């Protein structure tokens, strides 16, 4: 008769029957062993990630990493690029815009519609936020 081996508990069960496996899997020791197995696995995965990150920083190969500069100094532009250049070589130089304008996504940004909102001048009843429905009013019979 084949025996059932539990990898978590490192033991053989006496019988390979569903009821024996179910009883074993419901036991406290088995559940503790499973919990410890996955906790150790998660710690190993976290350590691997830390090691990979440390190795990447050591070799300076982090994708999107900002070049290291001395405190207070601006980063040096790439070779062959001048801050006032207009674009690729052979293209005419263009003067920078005097005021860049609002960031993209804010009202007034070029090429974007304004944010939806309540029309100006439509205030709600006193003590309530704008555009809230008015509370029901009671009418006096005449």
Curated annotation (Swiss-Prot):
Keywords: Metal-binding, Nucleus, Ribonucleoprotein, RNA-binding, Zinc, Zinc-finger. InterPro entries: Matrin/U1-C_Znf_C2H2, Matrin/U1-like-C_Znf_C2H2, U1-CZ_Znf_C2H2, U1_snRNP-C, Znf_C2H2_sf. GO terms for molecular function: mRNA binding; pre-mRNA 5'-splice site binding; U1 snRNA binding; zinc ion binding. It holds the Pfam family zf-U1. A zinc finger (Matrin-type) spans 4-36. One of its GO terms (cellular component) is U2-type prespliceosome. Its main location: nucleus. PROSITE patterns: ZF_MATRIN. One of its GO terms (biological process) is spliceosomal snRNP assembly. It is found in: Nucleus. U1 snRNP is composed of the 7 core Sm proteins B/B', D1, D2, D3, E, F and G that assemble in a heptameric protein ring on the Sm site of the small nuclear RNA to form the core snRNP, and at least 3 U1 snRNP-specific proteins U1-70K, U1-A and U1-C. U1-C interacts with U1 snRNA and the 5' splice-site region of the pre-mRNA. Belongs to the U1 small nuclear ribonucleoprotein C family. Component of the spliceosomal U1 snRNP, which is essential for recognition of the pre-mRNA 5' splice-site and the subsequent assembly of the spliceosome. U1-C is directly involved in initial 5' splice-site recognition for both constitutive and regulated alternative splicing. The interaction with the 5' splice-site seems to precede base-pairing between the pre-mRNA and the U1 snRNA. Stimulates commitment or early (E) complex formation by stabilizing the base pairing of the 5' end of the U1 snRNA and the 5' splice-site region. This is U1 small nuclear ribonucleoprotein C. It comes from Caenorhabditis briggsae. The lineage of its organism: Eukaryota, Metazoa, Ecdysozoa, Nematoda, Chromadorea.
């Amino acid at each position: 008769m084949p025996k059932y081996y539990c990898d978590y508990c490192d033991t053989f069960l006496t019988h390979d029957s569903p009821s024996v496996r179910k009883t074993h899997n419901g036991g406290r020791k088995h559940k503790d062993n499973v919990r410890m197995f996955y906790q150790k696995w998660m710690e190993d995965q976290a350590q691997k990630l830390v090691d990979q990150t440390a190795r990447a920083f050591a070799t300076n190969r982090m994708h999107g990493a900002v070049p290291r500069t001395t405190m207070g100094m601006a980063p040096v532009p790439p070779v062959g690029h001048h801050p006032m250049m207009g674009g690729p070589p052979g293209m005419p130089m263009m003067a920078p815009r005097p005021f860049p304008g609002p960031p993209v996504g804010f009202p007034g940004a070029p090429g974007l519609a304004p944010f939806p909102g309540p029309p100006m001048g439509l205030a709600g009843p006193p003590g309530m936020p704008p555009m809230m429905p008015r509370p029901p009013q009671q009418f006096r019979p005449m």
